[in-house]
């Protein structure tokens, strides 16, 4: 019997506790506020001696918060529905400038009795740039906003809005009220006059009503703002109620004169006659401002206008471009210098990607499109006739191949050209090969790059409508995209020729170690000279060493091609491979690439394969001929390593190669033309 009575007692006790969560609750502040007993304040919020809740003072860019100290149970269970609630408060906003203020007041229902993440200015102390709009905020608010913020789609600079987890109001309206005749009357939030606000939420219909009226007037029957939103998914079981406010650049004071709140019942009506009085806002300060401040502002505006004119003139000179009549046909390929300047953030050293003999390259992001680009600044002295050169640039820009760095266009100004390329995020190949790189490429990645560069060079030589001689094929001119595909870049040295024409040049351009002997002798750049450079590139990638290295310890010059040939002559050509590649590589493929590099480095241009043949060898469509220096000694054709790299005889069934008769080394061949 006793056990049964005890069970009934505990059941009744816990049922009583459970039911208590659904009971009504109300409070009212009619005679001023009394922190910290029943009110928690943060930021610049204070309570004046006569009991006014002063959310902000005349400090700029600050926030202020005030919350009822005890949590309120809005739901019977975490997954339950929100109970009905209502609130009423009287507020006033006083700004140092009669026509400007910042930034308003918000009634808030929040999960904590503070909003430490709230920013000042347009965020009214509620949210910040990062969390504005997050569902995890669990914040319901009614804002009295005095600043127009286009980012939040504000109605105007004098509006009331219903906010749920975001400052983009679900519903808003210009501040005002509907009188008994059904006419809308405007109210000015920053009028310095007290006004009353009512907020009502019906838990059954999910209807939210916000109503306003001037001080000492009854609550209008028609609400100012209405929205239907179920707050059950927004509010947690226990929440805090209070106010948030913030200042911007204008000195403003935000006051709460009285406040009442009710849960599961109407908020108690405020005893307006008992509310603390607002301080006297002396008009002297306003007149003083106009008397002293306005002349100062006028002077400031005059000087600002002069500064603005000077700035515009200087800006126009700064962004001045050269544009001639003949360039109009290339308009779509021309970039504005102003856009390139802002894209590269003023061509600052921080964005410098690299510097070469023909100019510096900067990274940039085009404004608006957010396209990542690389901008190369080239002096006018590095071109032919300007019209001819620009025509070539535009023509190159029409190329489309996955292994070429896209040339997007150009800009011309003040004795320099700016060439705009697509940006390659992984930079140039050379940084993965030399000087103990932090990140190295394995053989699969290297052969992928080699195939890509070969494909791009073949496109330039044979697949496009005009022959393009690149002139500077080397690892530093091979760029890697996001997937480590090799893309041939730097067409600043390229010349275009019609198919079948005889390419001529007046001076030698290129890089020592990649220049073919006949190129240094005659100054003529051909497809064969590009193949020679590609041969040096093959050895460079496979060995991880530069074609020519000056060794300070021995005061000697290291020649990569001589070194590789010497190892081949000893029957140990694989000893030339880059040790950084590791052991997991196709040795037959590495050997083929090394021998192909030697073949392409032949001092006789007629003995070098075309890029079409090179691609066949690399793809395995054709087998590289057996290249054995021992087999060549009987025919009087052999590689000279120490005494010279004079002759390279190749045993082709087609007998396409001819040897040299001299005894010069590769270095001598490159400098003297192979004679």
From Swiss-Prot:
Residues 23-291 are extracellular. ATP binds at residues 353-361, 376. In the C-terminal section; belongs to the protein kinase superfamily. Ser/Thr protein kinase family. Residues 313-675 are cytoplasmic. It comes from the Eukaryota. It catalyses: L-seryl-[protein] + ATP = O-phospho-L-seryl-[protein] + ADP + H(+); L-threonyl-[protein] + ATP = O-phospho-L-threonyl-[protein] + ADP + H(+). Residues 347-624 form the Protein kinase domain. GO terms for biological process: response to salicylic acid. Keywords: ATP-binding, Glycoprotein, Kinase, Lectin, Membrane, Nucleotide-binding, Receptor, Serine/threonine-protein kinase, Signal, Transferase, Transmembrane, Transmembrane helix. Its EC number is 2.7.11.1. It is a single-pass type I membrane protein. It is found in: Membrane. Pfam families: Lectin_legB, Pkinase. The active site is at 472 (proton acceptor). One of its GO terms (cellular component) is endoplasmic reticulum. This is L-type lectin-domain containing receptor kinase IV.1. Its main location: membrane. Residues 25-261 are annotated as: Legume-lectin like. It comes from Arabidopsis thaliana. InterPro entries: ConA-like_dom_sf, Kinase-like_dom_sf, L-type_Lectin-RKs, Legume_lectin_dom, Prot_kinase_dom, Protein_kinase_ATP_BS, Ser/Thr_kinase_AS. Glycans are attached at residues 57, 79, 112, 134, 153, 186. The lineage of its organism: Eukaryota, Viridiplantae, Streptophyta, Embryophyta, Tracheophyta. Residues 1-22 form the signal peptide. One of its GO terms (molecular function) is protein serine kinase activity. The chain crosses the membrane at residues 292-312.
